[in-house]
UniProtKB/Swiss-Prot annotation:
Assigned protein family: Belongs to the D-alanine--D-alanine ligase family.
Protein's organism: Rickettsia felis (strain ATCC VR-1525 / URRWXCal2)
Subcellular location: Cytoplasm
Binding site for Mg(2+) 1: E268, E282
PANTHER family, A to Z: D-ALANINE--D-ALANINE LIGASE, D-ALANINE--D-ALANINE LIGASE B
GO cellular component, one term: cytoplasm
Stated name of the protein: D-alanine--D-alanine ligase
Function comment: Cell wall formation.
Lineage: Bacteria, Pseudomonadati, Pseudomonadota, Alphaproteobacteria, Rickettsiales
One Pfam family matching this protein: Dala_Dala_lig_C
Domain ATP-grasp residue range list: 121-315
Length: 321
């Protein structure tokens, strides 16, 4: 089995991390998605912060019986530390809405929209947010040659952490006829824009700041580069002219608000080299909380340490009526 694919797990694993506290928080992480390992790493720091803040904490590595486990432990709040399928796509928020358990991060529609690249793109364009040109290619199209002019980007519709993303450059020995659609029957083929990778942390509707990612290895910001120390350098704050930096923050807040996000989010952009034009890539409603993650780094720059960041996220916990 490809470790970067969703796999079905019947039973959740439950571990009590702290037996007393002001409120009982279920920290749901791991799960069945391709981003399972990232979620588990994120949960390590989150669990320590929750205990430090004085909460009773139960860790749940989510399986298909998650509803049964939640009924058994009866938490006051669920901290949704999942990434990818079943957690980031709106499934867990939907369940928690039915169970009327307050939870962190965005709700059903916001999560589902942000997770699906076709629908989020339509939403962005409807709200006059600039994006790169793209087309949708179906496996059944049986395309035998490059669907667009090189260079271009192949993106699975519903994967995060750049899993399955490929950039096809002019000189690459790549035949589209051999592409096997490993993450579903559709992909987005997007115009490759050469430029500076910029990321913005947003918390409760307010942009905390922006950083630039400078690649030290690899040709683009892929899974390996994101989660391997020494593969990329983070320039925080992003070294931009004041007017451009402010525009970046305003655009991020606009995306957050139009998508009706909740709690933390991370907006991603490319600043085209030749024109200084901003192109939105996506908004991530379940940003990582690992030692190399961007939202905690920007929050620290804004004067919010990791423990206080987790406390601010907890304050936003709610369910949708």
């Amino acid at each position: 089995m490809n470790k970067y694919q969703t796999h079905w797990v019947e039973h959740s694993e439950v571990k009590i991390l702290s037996t007393t506290g002001k409120k009982h928080i279920a920290l749901v992480a791991g799960g069945m998605s391709a981003e399972r390992e990232v979620s588990l790493v994120s949960s390590e720091g989150v669990s320590k912060a929750l205990i430090e803040l004085g909460y009773k904490v139960t860790f749940i590595d989510m399986g298909a019986d998650i509803a049964v486990k939640l009924q058994e432990i009866k938490p006051d709040i669920v901290f949704n530390c999942l990434h990818g399928t079943y957690g980031e796509d709106g499934c867990l928020p939907g369940l928690l809405n039915i169970m009327r358990i307050p939870y962190t991060h965005s709700g059903v529609l916001s999560s589902a929209l942000a997770f699906d690249k076709i629908h989020s793109r339509s939403w962005f364009l409807t709200n006059n947010i600039n994006m790169a040109e793209s087309i949708i290619v179906n496996k059944s199209d049986n395309i035998k040659s490059d669907p667009v002019k090189r260079p271009y980007v192949i993106k699975p519709l519903t994967q995060g952490s750049s899993i399955g993303v490929e950039v096809i450059f002019e000189e690459d020995d790549f035949n589209f006829a051999d592409y096997n659609f490993p993450y579903g029957y559709q992909v987005i083929i997007e115009q490759y824009i050469k430029g500076r990778e910029l990321q913005v942390a947003v918390l409760n509707g307010k942009a905390l700041g922006a950083l630039e990612i400078k690649l030290l290895k690899n040709r683009f910001y892929d899974y390996e580069t994101k989660y391997t120390e020494g593969f990329a350098e983070h320039l925080c704050p992003a070294p931009l002219p004041t007017n451009l930096y402010e525009k970046l923050l305003v655009e991020s807040e606009k995306i957050y608000k139009t998508m009706n996000c909740k709690g933390p989010a991370r907006a991603e952009f490319i600043l085209e080299e030749q024109t200084n034009k901003l192109y939105a890539l996506e908004i991530n409603t379940h940003p990582g909380m690992t030692p190399l993650s961007i939202v905690p780094e920007i929050a620290a720059y804004a004067g919010i340490n990791f423990t206080n960041l987790i406390e601010e996220i907890i304050k936003t916990a709610s369910f949708e009526s």
